[in-house]
């Protein structure tokens, strides 16, 4: 029998200390990594519940284990809410991550060796869209499209040419570092000309899609995948959505279980369900609108200060800054900003002369700071401080001054009040 008085602090002081330190870091540092956000206390409560104890292989009312009546309720709520939230006919809430959601789609619709067309990793795509180190690049004939060098936007002419030349079995639209609106309908039409499946990975913009701040691909693509964190602001996990197609739905379910996963994480699925309910609120609509406004404010400041923002701005929650002209590396900028308690990630940019371990750019995103309550004025100040540092990376006094300002701003806007 477990004694509830045996808290983490008593049982494992090392882990308790690390978690405590991370809590302090999250409160004291400004988080600008585009794929990160803060979940609500309700989401964390669900994820920390006794549901972690329950094995439930299969799907609601079709389990291979007994005692699933209550987790069936939880998973069905998550499924129903996801379908309503995104206007989907089908939803699978079991993927442990966005990458596993993507892997399941590949397993469901393709066979090894099939040709796929996805966005190049160095131009803003994701590892699972055909990058060489990924299963998607190793097991399939992966062809990559990129950006127009002049505009920094997707090169749709190149997409069309590659489709005609390679006749892919599946086209992947979506990104991990792209700041403009993707023309989902164009991808649908070009996929139809090749008789290809269209898969959209909307992991980065799912929250914006929910509230209409970014166009929805769900009714356009054959299958849409997403993570449940990032802009969606739920727990870390994956989600597969689709329009009605019984054959594809069966393949997707089988690809997740028993294809690539065993028992679902019922505590995480409960947390997903909670976050989906939160995303139906009026407050959530206000939040997503502010996410985009804040990103645009920050991008404009960087442009005004003479830095190269890829594509010249943003239509979503993120933007890329290229420091090729300044001969700075993303790694150095990342480190300098981190010293000022501002967290970003170095990122490859178009025509980057540096390796992916060094890069010439950074990716900046506003979901987390907007959750804290940052408004346009806060984000304008923050962008100015960042530009000050980027203009003089070796100025330790400048970094110290910015760190003090960051500390004051974080006290003004706590993550958890």
UniProtKB/Swiss-Prot annotation:
(6S)-5,6,7,8-tetrahydrofolate binds at residues 121, 125-127, 355-357. It comes from the Bacteria. The record marks 229 as: Plays an important role in substrate specificity. GO terms for cellular component: cytosol. GO terms for biological process: glycine biosynthetic process from serine; tetrahydrofolate interconversion. The modification N6-(pyridoxal phosphate)lysine is found at residue 230. Its cofactor is pyridoxal 5'-phosphate. SUPFAM superfamilies: PLP-dependent transferases (SSF53383). It is an enzyme of class 2 (transferase). It catalyses: (6R)-5,10-methylene-5,6,7,8-tetrahydrofolate + glycine + H2O = (6S)-5,6,7,8-tetrahydrofolate + L-serine. Pathway: One-carbon metabolism; tetrahydrofolate interconversion; Amino-acid biosynthesis; glycine biosynthesis; glycine from L-serine: step 1/1. It is found in: Cytoplasm. Keywords: Amino-acid biosynthesis, Cytoplasm, One-carbon metabolism, Pyridoxal phosphate, Transferase. Its main location: cytoplasm. PROSITE patterns: SHMT. Its EC number is 2.1.2.1. Catalyzes the reversible interconversion of serine and glycine with tetrahydrofolate (THF) serving as the one-carbon carrier. This reaction serves as the major source of one-carbon groups required for the biosynthesis of purines, thymidylate, methionine, and other important biomolecules. Also exhibits THF-independent aldolase activity toward beta-hydroxyamino acids, producing glycine and aldehydes, via a retro-aldol mechanism. PANTHER family: SERINE HYDROXYMETHYLTRANSFERASE. Belongs to the SHMT family. This is Serine hydroxymethyltransferase.
């Amino acid at each position: 029998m477990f004694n509830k008085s045996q808290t983490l602090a008593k049982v494992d002081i090392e882990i308790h200390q690390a978690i405590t330190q991370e809590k302090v870091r999250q409160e004291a540092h400004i988080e600008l990594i585009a794929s990160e956000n803060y979940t609500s206390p309700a989401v964390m409560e669900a994820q920390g519940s006794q549901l972690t104890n329950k094995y439930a292989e299969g799907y609601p009312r079709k389990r291979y284990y007994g005692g699933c009546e209550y987790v069936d309720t939880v998973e069905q709520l998550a499924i129903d809410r996801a379908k309503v939230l995104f206007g989907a006919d089908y939803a699978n809430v079991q993927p442990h991550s966005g990458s596993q959601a993507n892997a399941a789609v590949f397993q469901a619709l393709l066979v090894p060796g099939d040709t796929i067309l996805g966005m190049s990793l160095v131009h803003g795509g994701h590892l699972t869209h055909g990058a060489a180190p990924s299963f998607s690049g190793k097991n399939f004939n992966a062809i990559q499209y990129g950006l127009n060098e002049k505009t920094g936007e997707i090169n749709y002419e190149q997409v069309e040419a590659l489709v005609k030349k390679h006749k892919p079995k599946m086209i992947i639209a979506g990104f991990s570092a792209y700041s403009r609106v993707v023309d989902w309908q164009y991808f649908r039409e070009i996929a139809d000309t090749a008789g290809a499946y269209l898969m959209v990975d909307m992991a980065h913009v799912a929250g914006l899609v929910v509230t209409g701040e970014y166009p929805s691909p769900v009714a356009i693509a054959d299958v849409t995948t997403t993570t449940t964190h990032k802009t969606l602001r739920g727990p870390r996990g994956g989600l597969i959505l689709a329009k009605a197609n019984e054959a594809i739905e069966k393949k997707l379910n089988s690809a997740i279980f028993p294809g690539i996963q065993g028992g679902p994480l019922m505590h995480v699925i409960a947390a997903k369900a909670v976050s989906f309910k939160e995303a139906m609120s009026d407050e959530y609509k206000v939040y997503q609108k502010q996410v985009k406004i804040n990103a645009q404010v920050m991008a404009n400041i960087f442009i005004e200060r003479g830095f190269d923002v890829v594509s010249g701005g943003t239509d979503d929650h993120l933007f890329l800054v290229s420091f090729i002209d300044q001969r700075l590396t993303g790694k150095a900028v990342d480190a300098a900003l981190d010293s000022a308690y501002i967290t970003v990630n170095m990122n490859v940019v178009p025509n980057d002369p540096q390796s992916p371990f060094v890069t010439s750019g950074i990716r900046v995103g506003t979901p987390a700071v907007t959750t804290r309550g940052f408004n346009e004025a806060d984000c304008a100040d923050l962008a100015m401080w960042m530009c000050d540092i980027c203009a003089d990376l070796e100025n330790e006094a400048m970094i110290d001054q910015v760190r003090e300002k960051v500390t004051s701003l974080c006290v003004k806007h706590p993550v958890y009040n």
